[in-house]
Amino acid sequence: MSTQTEPKLVTQIDFARAGQITPQMKEVAEREHRDPEYIRERVADGRIAIPANIVHIKKGMRAFGVGEGLSTKVNVNLGISGDKADAAEEWKKVKIAEDYGSDAIMDLSNSGKTRQFRQQLIDETPLMVGTVPMYDAIGYMEKPLVKLTKDDLFEVVRAHAEDGVDFMTIHCGINKSVTKTFKETGRLMNIVSRGGSLLFGWMEVTGNENPFYEYFDELLKICHEYDVTISLGDSCRPGCLYDSNDATETAEMIELGKLCKRAWAVGVQVMVEGPGHMALDEIAANMKLQKRLCHNAPFYVLGPLVTDIGVGYDHITAAIGGAISASSGADFLCYVTPAEHLCLPNAQDVLDGLMATKIAAHAADIAKKVPHARDMDDKMGQARRKLDWDAMWKCALDPVTGKKRYEESPAATEGTCTMCGKMCAVRTVNKVFEGTTIDLGMED
C-alpha cells in the first residue's frame, strides 16, 4: 500500500484544481452574478485571481475576484511617507477608500517601522490589502540599500505574508537580461518604478542578479504558504509617452509571462502590472499584447496616463486611459490622484482620484457587457425622468457630493435645479404628457 500523502490544499488555485468551490469563490460568484463553477474554472487556470491571504480571511475580509468576465476592480494607494509622516491622515484615506467603494488598499508606507500601521489596516479593513515589500526593506532591516542581502529581502516578504497581506507587488521581472536591453536601447525617463529603481540600483552596485528573479521558487513557497497573490511588478513601465511600448517594457513583459507559468505550476495566484504613460491609440494593442504574453493573467494597470502635461489633473488623464485599458482587457485599475507627480495626496485628492477611477472602471464594465453593469445607469435614467432627486442619490457613485452641490444652490421651482429652473426640459415634456399647463415664468 502506498504511504504517499495527498498534497495539502492551501491556495484558491489548489482548491479550484481539486474541483472544490471555496467560500471565497461562492462570494465572488454572488457579487459578480456568475455561476460558482465559472469562477472555479478560471481560478484554476489563472484567468481569475482572488487575493485573499488565509490570515486576512480569518479576520473577516470580503472576497474580491480580479480577472476575466468580472467587474473592473479599483485600488487606492496610501501609506506613511518619510517627508510627511502622519498616520492619522492616512487613516482618513482608509475611511474614504472604504466609504466610497474601493475594492483594495495598497499600503505603500516607506518610512520607519511600518508594521504597526500595516497590521492594524489588515485587522480593520475588509478590503483587499496589497503592499510592496521592497519599499519597506530598508526601514525594516535598518540597513542601506546596497547592504541588503537576499535573505533580508525575503524576510520582509515573509513578514508581510504573516501579517495577512493579500497581494504583494514584487518586481521579479527586471533581471540582468532586461537591464541589458534597458542600458543598450536607452529611455527618456529611464526607470520610474520605485521598487524597480531600487532593485536596479542594488543590481548595478552589487553586480548580482535580482534575488526575486534568481530565487523565484523560494518566493513562491512563501506566497503559497499564506495564499498571497503575487502581483508581478512592471519595473520598466513607461514613465512618459516617449517610452511606451519600447524594447525595455516589452522585454520585461516577456519575462513576466514566463514567471506567470512558474507560479501557476505550484499553485500560486498571479496578477501582472502594467503601464504607466501611453498614447490613447496605443492602449488597446498593449492590453492585448500583455494578455497574450502573460497567458490571460489578470492585468493591473496604473491608468495609463494619456498625456504627460496634465499636471494637477492627472486623475483625469489616468481615468481616460483607464476606461480604454479596462474596456480592452485590463482587470484592475490603480487610482491616480490630482497630486500625482507633485506631492503626497491629501484626503480630498484621494476622494477625487478614487471617484475618477471608479467612473473609468464602470464605463469599461458597461462596454465589456459585465453582467448587470448598466443596471444603476438605467435606474438613474428612470429617476431623472421623474425628477426624483432622492432616487438619483441612491443611484449615484458619489451621492454625498451630488446632494451637497444640489442643496447648495436651491431652485425656486420644486423638482428642478438652478441650471434650468422652470425651463427644465424633463419638466416640460412631463407636463406635456400629463396634459398640464407649461408655466415657464414668462407669463407674468
Stretch-by-stretch model annotation:
Residues M1-V10, M442-D444:
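Basic/polar N-terminal segments that are highly enriched at the extreme N-terminus
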Residues T3, T11-F15, Q20-I309, Y313, ...:
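Alpha/beta enzyme core
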